[in-house]
């Protein structure tokens, strides 16, 4: 019915109160002896660390008005996993012109359909990342388009968005 993953997503997300108690908006772990370990825990490849260091610069310069990246770092710092259901359980209406952060018009394919959860739940036998899911998730989120977009400075992206609107 679901799997565990090292990867994170806040689209259609939910959490437990005990996990949220660890939320570290200030990211107090930075410049500590744990920083490299936490960064390494964000992904599986060296390029992932480079990407997440870039996200830190965006946060430091207040280019993003979001909390989700800090949440991702919190999960990494606490070595917590995410749970992904077999099927999307929500219809995400947070895309498009009225959206706060995701103003792109193209809604990702995994939000097109949703299903109700099926009972009884089929639980994974172990609480470890499910590698098959993680490979697919990584490939989907690291397509050529997304990879190129990462290297375009945020100011330019914001300028282009304003022109398009």
Regions found by a protein language model. Give the residues of each.
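An acidic/histidine-cluster motif and surrounding catalytic segment
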Residues: 1-165
């Amino acid at each position: 019915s679901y799997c565990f993953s090292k990867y994170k997503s806040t689209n259609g997300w939910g959490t437990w109160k005990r996990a949220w108690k660890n939320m570290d908006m200030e990211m107090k772990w930075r410049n500590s002896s744990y920083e490299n370990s936490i960064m390494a825990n964000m992904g599986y490849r060296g390029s992932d660390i480079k990407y997440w260091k870039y996200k830190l610069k965006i946060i430091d310069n207040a280019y993003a008005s979001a909390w989700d990246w800090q949440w991702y770092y919190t999960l990494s710092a606490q070595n917590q996993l995410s749970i992904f259901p077999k099927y999307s359980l929500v219809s995400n209406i947070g895309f498009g012109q009225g959206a706060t952060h995701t103003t792109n018009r193209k809604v990702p394919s995994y939000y097109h359909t949703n299903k109700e959860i099926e009972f009884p739940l089929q639980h994974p036998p172990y609480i470890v990342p499910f590698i098959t899911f993680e490979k697919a998730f990584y490939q989907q989120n690291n397509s050529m388009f997304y990879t190129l977009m990462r290297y375009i400075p945020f100011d330019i992206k914001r300028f282009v968005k304003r022109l398009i609107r």
